[in-house]
Amino acid sequence: MSHAQADGSAPNRIHPTAVLGEGVELGGGNVIGPYTVIVGPVRIGDGNWIGPHVTIGTPGEDRGGPHPVAWEDAPTGDPALDGHGVVIGSRNRIREYAGVHQGTWRASTLGDDCYLLRGSHIGHDAVVGDHVTLACNVLLGGHTHVWSHANLGMGTVVHQGARIGPGAMVGMGSAVRREVGAFTITVGNPARASGVNLVGLSRRGLDEATVEALTPWVKGKGDLPDDGLPDDLSTLVKAWDARPREEH
């Protein structure tokens, strides 16, 4: 099976039992563990640790969709990933038995510096931002969007099409049926907001006064503060605040 590696990049370490199908593009410095299966079209960045028994690029769970023998044949999808496929960034840790499905109308996407624990799953057409943690057995339905710095606890289930806001903390065993607000703490079945993720905000470099100024916005009772937020956080929350109305 063939795979591409960026010229001049660090070598990839791929276990001999791993299967990489046609249309899999690798950056450099990736580790791919035993019995992992990656089928194209898939583009993976640099420095990822992909453990044993991981599956990336298998078909989306659509009963009427095609299920090709992609580990033997060249992919039938768009090799430019303009519509479907999988795109994974850099420096992610993807633990054993995790899975990422192909997209059907857009690429299923995982950003940079994420940690996917054992048995977590990213469904077709899902978008996961940067620095996201999916704990053991977290299941993301198709078309979901998890924004950067979110943390989903063990066994959380996210209904297809749901949105998890930036910096949100979702408690273990939660069933998310609709949108979860930015930097909220959410728990239960159905999941409901129970507070503000103060720890997450402090880790983003906010002092007590700035957290206090931002809290009304987090609770949906005020506007974003005009200043005081670090540039990267300001960009993130402004993008969330300006998301299309149908995502509210």
For each feature predicted by the language model, list its residue ranges:
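Short, amphipathic C-terminal "tail helix"
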Residues: 227-248
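Structural signal for interior beta-strand "rungs" in well-ordered beta-sheet cores
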Residues: 7-192
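Short, low-complexity, intrinsically disordered N-terminal peptides in bacterial proteins
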Residues: 1-11, 246-248
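Conserved beta-strand-loop-alpha-helix hinge in the C-terminal portion
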Residues: 184-206
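Interhelical loop and adjacent transmembrane-helix boundary motif
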Residues: 218-221
